[in-house]
Amino acid sequence: YTSEGEEYAEVKAQDFVTGLKHAADGKSDGLSLLQDSIKGLAAYISGESNDFSTVGVKAVDDYTVEYTLNKPESFWNSKVTTATMLPVNEEFLNSKGKDYGTPTPSSILYNGPYLLKSLTSKSAIEYEKNPNYWDKDNVKIDSIKLTFYDGSDQESLIRSFTQGAYTTARLFPTSSNFESTKK
């Protein structure tokens, strides 16, 4: 779906192949977790091979992705949940060019429970419930706002947290009024 909630295209197995290729071509930081797992990926990333078809990922059909691993990994299922393994629609990627994935709502396609509504650098990120999400009836939170905190004023953070301005906050035991937040 687009940031406006309009259907763009159905997610297909090929989107997962495109996503991994896009991450590899862009030398994504997240590849370090995967490069020794997927057959041929390390060679492609290093430039030893320039043929992505030698990488152990393929779309078997519209709804089946097959990964070939260098060796069995009991924790593989947790690796496929990382951002590097997300689907990328090739047509959308090509239409956005260098703007794909930039921090603006229209530069990203969405297939999860939330749509990005706004992102203000070093300030806030706001999400709204995706009305077209397949399991929307079980998404109980309508909107999410993540507020940036630079760590400079622990006292203010704790005050805001205890007064209900934040539902969660990373609090540090070195703050003078940390004890009051334990309850």
Predicted features and spans:
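A diffuse structural propensity rather than consistent per-protein peaks
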Residues: V11-K12, A124, T174
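Early extracytoplasmic/lumenal segment of secretory-pathway proteins
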Residues: Y1-A9, Q154-F161
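Second-shell loop/turn segments in exported
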Residues: Y1-E7, S53-V55, I144-F148
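Surface-exposed binding/hinge segments that line
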Residues: E7-E91
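Gly/Pro-rich hinge or "lid" segments in bacterial periplasmic/extracellular proteins
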Residues: N50-T54, D62-Y63, L69-V139, S143
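Ligand-site clamp/hinge motif
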Residues: Y100-P105, N132-S180
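Short, intrinsically disordered, charge-balanced linker/junction segments flanking boundaries
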Residues: T2-E4, N70, T174-K183
